[in-house]
């Protein structure tokens, strides 16, 4: 199996070979991302394998990152640092974060 970093570089090379970094826009790639997310939703709804859909989403996200000199790892680090101390609770199977008001007091999640 190919390592993550090698595979990420192969995907970047694939994008460049097809002019999908310089020849596309963030908005076009966002539209593509929504298309891939919809395919994921359909396969989840029908209890079908969705590994290709997740992979396609990652391919588009790598494109968006590359055009802004980021990596998925960079973005995951930012996201993790944002959530690592987050508090909240589960509501209908989804984690809802507590809110912090202007005075810095934590308000319980809905």
Model-predicted regions and their roles:
Residues 1-54, 58-110:
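Flexible "arm" and connector segments at domain edges
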């Amino acid at each position: 199996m190919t390592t993550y970093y090698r595979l990420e570089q192969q995907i970047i090379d694939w994008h460049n070979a097809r002019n999908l970094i310089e020849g596309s826009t963030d908005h076009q790639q966002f539209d593509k991302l929504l298309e891939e997310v919809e395919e994921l939703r359909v396969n989840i709804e029908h209890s079908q394998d969705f590994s290709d859909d997740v992979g396609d989403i990652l391919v588009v996200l790598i494109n968006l990152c590359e055009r802004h000199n980021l990596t998925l790892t960079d973005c995951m680090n930012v996201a993790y640092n944002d959530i690592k101390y987050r508090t909240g609770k589960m509501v209908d199977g989804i984690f809802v974060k507590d809110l912090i008001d202007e005075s810095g007091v934590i308000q319980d999640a809905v």
